[in-house]
């Protein structure tokens, strides 16, 4: 099965819809600079969300070879702060799909350069919608969980999505 994208550089491009292009995660590294911190020298929560959102968009595009926008964020849990000078390692993985949407689980860890040890500081689900050049939703390949852990993450993402829909979001 194929789908065509209209408009932009990809106009007329045939896209294979038989399965995802890649189910591998995306990991990115960012450094916490002074402008990223508050009066307590800790990373702004909004800056961390932006870093995580970028990783979610990257892994969604890698998964489906589409352009994506963020439609919602759910179950975001800030566990520990990150400080100026820390490195932030963000890993995003597609764990759920629907017709137009990729559910992405994102985990952020801080790396303290003095000890070179990582600790998880935040995690959550980002729901990304594939769009065409007119900003209209378009279909994406579907993710099929393999194994207990992938099924567990699928179920968590589905529960988060269902809760958002029930709340009218």
Where are these regions (language model features)?
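HotDog/MaoC-like acyl-thioester-processing domains
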Residues: 5, 15-17, 23-28, 83-84, ...
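Hydrophobic beta-strand-centered segment that forms part of the acyl-chain substrate-binding groove
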Residues: 19-23, 43, 54-91, 95-102, ...
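A short small-residue
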Residues: 30-36
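A conserved, well-ordered hydrophobic junction motif at loop->secondary-structure transitions
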Residues: 37-50
